[in-house]
Amino acid sequence: MAFQIPRGTQDLLPGETEKWQYVEQVARDLCRRYGYEEIRTPIFEHTELFLRGVGDTTDIVQKEMYTFEDKGGRALTLRPEGTAPVVRAFVEHKLYGSPNQPVKLYYAGPMFRYERPEAGRFRQFVQFGVEAIGSSDPAIDAEVMALAMHIYKALGLKHIRLVINSLGDVDSRRAHREALVRHFSDRIHELCPDCQARLETNPLRILDCKKDRDHELMASAPSILDYLNDESSAYFEKVKQYLTMLDIPFVIDSRLVRGLDYYNHTTFEIMSEAEGFGAAATLCGGGRYNGLVQEIGGPETPGIGFALSIERLLAALEAEGIELPIHRGIDCYVVAVGERAKDETVRLVYELRRAGLRVEQDYLGRKMKAQLKAADRLGASFVAIIGDEELEKQTAAVKHMASGEQTDVPLGELASFLIERTKREE
């Protein structure tokens, strides 16, 4: 029987993994520049965390979670998103008592959702996320959005758009909820079954419906921006002011509510506008979650964050025709001619690697010509040929693959020679 990977997952082979490593490293470096530190949480958590943290009326909880019972009878769930686990760790380890506030964290890792696989959407996918917990300053909202935009710009993306909205505070959302119920009640039967159920449980989520997004009831729905109280409106104005000061263009979409229940005040998405990118145009989403820490058992603590999909980021780079500056070649391929030379190259290759060089050798007993072809396929900058004659002189015949120039180099000086030459070519 030939086994295949489960539906909605993917294997990342050499040549692809380097792209992932590159974009993740760019994101990590920028996070450190902005003062964020890495946190790592388990891949599975107690199911109750997501019921309370994400919201038991959300599609994620109702339809998409991978939940199982362990041998001790505990209900556990593969994490479908990263914010609730990070906030759980923040509360469990009492990071709210840290003298360094706000606590600024980033994470990267696989998430799991039982969704219909399609372009840009997987059942196992990798999120890179940021959380800033402990500040209700609108400036940190702007910083978080600036960091997200900085990551995309640093990778060369040009056709992206920042979309923002405000969901306001508790009072603003309550007034908006009542207006939505009045608006949809008489004609709710025209919408999908999910929307009909949401009218009772969470009317705001009707605006996030993908099936009925073009229905005229959606277009005429009351805008949250008309129900913001003075405090919420002033907060949103300050966020917009900071974004303008940072020269970060944005558009406002009053229907942007996000698919998680913990959001309030600022919500945002970064969209790809690349031609032909398709339906998965949302690259990144985030917002403020001032009640989540308290919901998970901690003190009342504000927070804001975002998560981006690495898969969609790479798809956006491809859509814009951006080639990442990845060098897959090696510094040197050591060619052994004869058994005596083979014994010497085993030791020599190890020494060159210890010196910091990327080095390969033959393990298939190939002739010199075949070894040289292998070196070329691996993108070797140099080959070092060692045969009986070179062993007698304790040298290697070093050939520069690009120019064909060949030089005899003492074995004891080979590492320093290669280091100096490879640095010169960088």
Curated annotation (Swiss-Prot):
Source organism? Geobacillus thermodenitrificans (strain NG80-2)
The EC number on file is 6.1.1.21
Identification of the protein by name = Histidine--tRNA ligase
Q: Which GO terms describe its cellular component?
A: cytoplasm
Q: Which proteins does it associate with, and in what oligomeric form?
A: Homodimer.
Chief location category: cytoplasm
User: So what does this thing catalyse?
Assistant: tRNA(His) + L-histidine + ATP = L-histidyl-tRNA(His) + AMP + diphosphate + H(+)
Top EC class for this record: ligase
Gene3D superfamilies in alphabetical order: Anticodon-binding domain, Bira Bifunctional Protein, Domain 2
Q: Which GO terms describe its molecular function?
A: ATP binding; catalytic activity, acting on a protein; histidine-tRNA ligase activity; transferase activity
Asked whether the keyword Ligase is assigned, the reply is yes
Family in the record: Belongs to the class-II aminoacyl-tRNA synthetase family.
| Keyword ATP-binding belongs to the record | yes
- Where is this protein found? Cytoplasm
An example of a Gene Ontology BP annotation on this entry? histidyl-tRNA aminoacylation
Q: Per the record, a Pfam family?
A: tRNA-synt_His
